[in-house]
Amino acid sequence: MAIKKLSTSSFSSGTKISKLWDQITNSTITVEYLVIGGGGSGGAQIGGGGGAGGYRTAAGLVISKNISHVITVGAGATHPGDRGGGYKGSSSSFGNYITSEGGGAGGGFGGNGGNGGSGGGGAGQDGGTTSGGIATLGQGNNGGAGQSNRLSAGGGGAGGVGQNGGNGSGGSSSTSTITGTSIARAGGGGGRGSSRGGDATLNTGSGGGGGGNISGNSGDDGVGYGRGGFGGSGVVIIQSPQLAVQTTGSPTYINPSANVHVYVFNSDGSIKF
């Protein structure tokens, strides 16, 4: 039996599909990320704790190659001095893909906590209660409620809500191993201390502590008020199976194992694969 001439159209179409697939796979890369916003500051005058910055993390994010992705690291909120409520932290972002809100402000005497990535804690007051701030959906937890008898609340954290008045503890942090080491970040600030509120650690996105009713240097005579604590600045961490071809902003590079490349941004910058 004679052999018919084979058509090359099927081979041609298969080659086109293969080339198209190569173009798609060579133009994208799949990464893991951790993006944390800046923490809110604590309120003064029996203030509530600041909320932690929004906390977003996941693997399997497909991003474009051959373009620079802008990294923004949110600043932690400054303290309000010895009067008034705290301030909201600034948001952090990874290109156009992921944004994490800044943490909510801690309330000053008699004031409610502010909304944010995690909510700020309500302040204490002489009578009645104050409400905690509301967290951004999927990014954190609510702040606690302040109570009468001057009992302030903790700010929300990535891992839990802030405790209600009783000079409540801040909400728990959340732990990540994206760098190859287990590190806890984004805890809520505690309610008022005995004097000034504690400042949060840089690049953790944690909230600042609430200020007490007596300033640190005024003794027990009621002169002055303790300020709230600063919020911690945020952080953006990218883990990829390939080395970046270009970065700006001097990120810390970590190579925990073969084909695992981690870039830790503690300040603004960019990354290109």
Where are these regions (language model features)?
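Low-complexity, glycine/proline-biased repetitive segments and flexible coils/loops
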Residues: 2-14, 19, 30-273
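Large eukaryotic, non-enzymatic subunits of multiprotein complexes that serve as scaffolds/tethers
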Residues: 20-24
